[in-house]
């Protein structure tokens, strides 16, 4: 089953940091990621397609529930499909930049192979819907998953002989993710929260998040709203 098996490990490797992305976003944009502008209109259209497709895949909700029961972090936010979709779109773009900067790429053949190994496109579609995106992003999602797996393999996360070596490798990849976010000048519209690099998720939506001091770092490295 296609999942993001290294997300929790990378979040742990980033513990203690409080790097967030939230700044002045141009009118009409949900997020700016380098030269990519995710408009609010595009985000709403994406969520609309997702909501129409979801009932056709009963297994999608089951996949999300099983992942949560197993203690895995699933970025799907039932209270805000827009935040779920925006997170996925931003996350894929950041990983693309990590791969580009490190010379790691994924071919169409690799994507096809993973789809075949995981039960075909219908299974992948259900997994993608469980993550909050419509099926038109299925191949992009698989490509992103394979890309991060290639990076983990390259830096020894999956081949480490001991926990210390694995942690060091994770921290190296986590640092690459942070630097990619900085290079891209990742900027999220405050109405959707701020991007929390420690947890690799969108942080809370703060009523006054547009103010520089409204997102406050917590002792765990995340971000909370001021009272």
What positions do the PLM features span?
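Proteostasis/folding factors centered on peptidyl-prolyl cis-trans isomerases
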Residues: 125-159, 203-227
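Acidic/polar surface patches and capping/hinge elements
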Residues: 135-137, 154, 158-188
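Hydrophobic membrane-targeting alpha-helices
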Residues: 17-21, 98, 150, 154
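N-terminal targeting/tethering segments
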Residues: 25-135
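Short, low-structural-confidence N-terminal segments
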Residues: 1-76, 174-227
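Charged/polar, solvent-exposed surface patches and flexible loops
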Residues: 45, 49-52, 109, 113-117, ...
